[in-house]
Amino acid sequence: MEALGVAQREEASVRILTEDALRTSAIEGETLDADQVRSSLARRMGLATAGLPPPSREVDGLVEMMLDATRQAGAALTEERLLGWHAALFPVGGSPLVRITSGAWRTAASGPMRVVSGAYGHERVHFEAPSHDRVAGEIRGFLDWFNAPLVVDPVIASALAHFWFVTIHPFEDGNGRVSRAIADLALARADRSDLRFYSMSAQIETERSAYYGMLERTQKGGTDITGWLVWFLGCLGRALDRGEKSVAAIIRKASTWERINAGIPVNERQRAVIHA
């Protein structure tokens, strides 16, 4: 990272955060407008927004959660903070077709939270989350552990937090996105930096089938979560490799512009290619 100047660090950060927002949504089958994501990020990071469209409330809420998780990583993770993230993700209470209660734990009204497959009447239940009346207690136990002094490696803590929260499944919707934000918060603590030059969500989306398969096998497999930990650490390693390549591309582009500014003539078409 030392090879990056201030402008290049900002470019790298916006690029990675944009990809993170797009991919954590894509994992759940949602497609966001990349320019709206960049617009929301730029505004919150004090960067120029000229030419960018105003973001939707949903995009703004996702970006708000992501930045709060990574840039306020040292702050305690509380019920109020989690509920605030959920309210930001669903500012109008879900979609017109599927309404949910925003900023609240699930209740009896939402019914059992199950992961199923198969035709109606012949469903196969892969996993069933704790019942609604256990959610508050499960969350308190999770937060007590998460905020206590670490007794495991912080990267392992990130993997544990991701799995634990998504297994509680405390919300009607958005559990995956919130669990990945919690994992990013734990990784930011491990990195001891609020700057992120890799995207775990981008790598998870690339390995989406393996991600869901490993979650299912681990949730059905009792108390041994070794397989999940091994997969998560491998995925993180691949995310770091991917991030390194992205940063290297930014460094190459910056070096090219330095040579151009030193007097090498280029036309508009060449400039457009360099900016791409």
Please tell me what each predicted stretch does:
Residues 1-276:
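FIC/Doc superfamily catalytic core
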